[in-house]
């Protein structure tokens, strides 16, 4: 394979979702084994909100929530912080390689309000459940934490309501039609594409250099950034978005991304299991109403906003301004949750047990239960897809006739 063939196939073209999500599952497994924590983003975004408040004299470090997730240090001294910086760098490099960076403004104030309000709801729900589509779902289920299953089911339900809500007439933005005499071919400016590809390489190797230099003195921080770059490349090149996985399933019947996510978790689970058997402690959270309520809010919020915690990150660096507002909403929502946490934490979370399936059913029993539940989820998704298109077929035939 020549350089030009490799460049076009792997650095410019989008990647297939299933292999990319499987790769993300494997990468997240090694990330857990090496750093001792799971791939997660909203916890760090919440810390950013807390530290912004500290700049204005607010003693956020005294809030109960920040005593749980820890507010010490800065993004440059925290594993999650360095990983997220790596993610942004990886996303930006991948977008530049493909010449997929362009400033795109929201076309309506309604879209901006959707982004902010949906982002706030999603951020609040994610932190109520102690995780978003990563820590309470994609990387939470392979940790064998029961709360992640509560969150996943509730998120699916919340996304159904979100999909129905966003189909209301108020969200239908008028499309401006422009008369043309012929179709315009899709073209790129070769010089611009070359410049951006080189800039992408500069960003990529710059991030690698930063990570390796950091790893010389602080190995975990440097490796966290390297993992972040890998995660960023995967989510941008494969356009991995959990919002589309849920929303598309309800609206269009497409389940390709949802299936990919299930398979990715199945691959990750056995790796996490092996690390746990070697003595690494899994991340188990409270299996209480917080997981259910948080999941409902999160599912509704991500569909209203149009993007989840990973989806908005790569779209933001591609220049889609709508997702800058989603990200801002996430930080605001998660910070609001941190402020009110002490008021309802006992009733919704901390008075409930942290249930580890590997302890409840034994190591092999917990592993088996997890795979049975993943298989059941996959069968339900396939069943929904068949039902959706079976119901849609007569309507399509009627429209054609």
UniProtKB/Swiss-Prot annotation:
Subcellular compartments: Cell inner membrane
**Mind telling me which InterPro entries this protein's record contains?**
Sulf_transp_TsuA/YedE, YedE-like
Its principal location?
membrane
The protein's UniProt keywords, in alphabetical order, are: Cell inner membrane, Cell membrane, Membrane, Transmembrane, Transmembrane helix, Transport
Is Cell membrane set as a keyword in this record? yes
Which regions face the Periplasmic side of the membrane?
35-78, 139-147, 220-221, 281-283, 342-363
Its record classes its membrane topology as:
Multi-pass membrane protein
Please name one Pfam family that this protein belongs to: Sulf_transp
Q: Which GO terms describe its cellular component?
A: plasma membrane
Q: Topological domain, Cytoplasmic: which ranges?
A: 1-13, 100-115, 171-198, 243-259, 305-320, 385-401
Range of residues in the leader sequence: none
| Residue ranges crossing the lipid bilayer per the database entry | 14-34, 79-99, 116-138, 148-170, 199-219, 222-242, 260-280, 284-304, 321-341, 364-384
Q: Which family does it belong to?
A: Belongs to the TsuA/YedE (TC 9.B.102) family.
- Name of this chain's protein: Probable transporter YedE
Task: Identify the species of origin.
Answer: Escherichia coli (strain K12)
